[in-house]
Amino acid sequence: MAAELKTITVLGAGGKMGMRISANFQKSDYQVFYCENSPRAQEQVVAAGRELSIAEQVIPESDVVILAVPDIALKAVSGIVVPQMKSNAVLLTLDPAAAYANLIAKRDDIDYAVAHPCHPSVFLDRFTPEEHADAFGGVAAPQHVAASYETGSDEQKATLARVVKVMYGPVIDVHWVTVKQLAYLEPTLVETVACMVGTLMKEALDETINTIGVPEAAAKAMLYGHIQIALAVAFRSTNPFSDACMIAIEYGKENIIKPDWKKIFDEKELDLVIAKMLKIDAIER
């Protein structure tokens, strides 16, 4: 039987993600300790009505220790935190990069997990102004979570999922994958591809307005509406693209996308981009 997870420590509680997840934990039944080193960030934690704790005092008591710190700091922070954790506790990180790169300090008698929010879907049915305003998730709009807990049993995953659903809530479902699969989801799928395409569309909009001279309101209206229909047709087959549109699509692929672009799904390319993100020379295994 999986041990119940009752006590949680959030390290980096005053950072961007730390503040987001702490706001949800504050409304939960978990016993939560909030730890933050930065004086300015400490002020934010206190201003939000949360009491600061001393990490060295609460880490040994915690069933789950959450590292809400930047990826590039995880090696150093985990090196300090992991030796202080009690046996059978769970170290939970929020991004897969450092775990994939084997930068997290190791101990045989604790568990490791990663949980990352998917953010509310573009296809989500939203019914309230609060849901419409919540683009990031974790406030009002429901979202999914992708997570990895490779050493966990189904029962342990279910227990940790309850923690994850609180911290990122409201949550529709938690999808369990491997650390490597999670790394392919982010950065490869959603940052290397989706976020890159988002910035490309913004650059194209700017070019249309500033170089071609199309009025800004007209350009935005046309693009924003067509983003919606392009996604609906491509992902949900609501209607087929017209023959003329397909010609324009192929022209765009030929002129914008490299023929070998799918190499980004090669493992060596995943290693390369994550090494760049973590500011390390290479990933060692």
Swiss-Prot record:
SUPFAM superfamilies: NAD(P)-binding Rossmann-fold domains. Its EC number is 1.1.1.421. It is an enzyme of class 1 (oxidoreductase). One of its GO terms (molecular function) is NADP binding. Its cofactor is Zn(2+). NAD(+) binds at G15, K16, M17, E36, D71. The keyword Zinc applies. InterPro entries: 6PGDH_NADP-bd, NAD(P)-bd_dom_sf, PGDH_C, Preph/Arog_dehydrog, Semialdehyde_DH-like_C. Zn(2+) binds at H116, E186. It catalyses: D-apionate + NAD(+) = 3-oxoisoapionate + NADH + H(+). GO terms for biological process: tyrosine biosynthetic process. It comes from the Bacteria. Keywords: Carbohydrate metabolism, Metal-binding, NAD, Nucleotide-binding, Oxidoreductase, Zinc. Pathway: Carbohydrate metabolism. Pfam families: NAD_binding_2 (PF03446), PGDH_C (PF16896). Belongs to the ApnO family. Involved in catabolism of D-apiose. Catalyzes the conversion of D-apionate to 3-oxo-isoapionate. This is D-apionate oxidoisomerase. The gene is apnO.
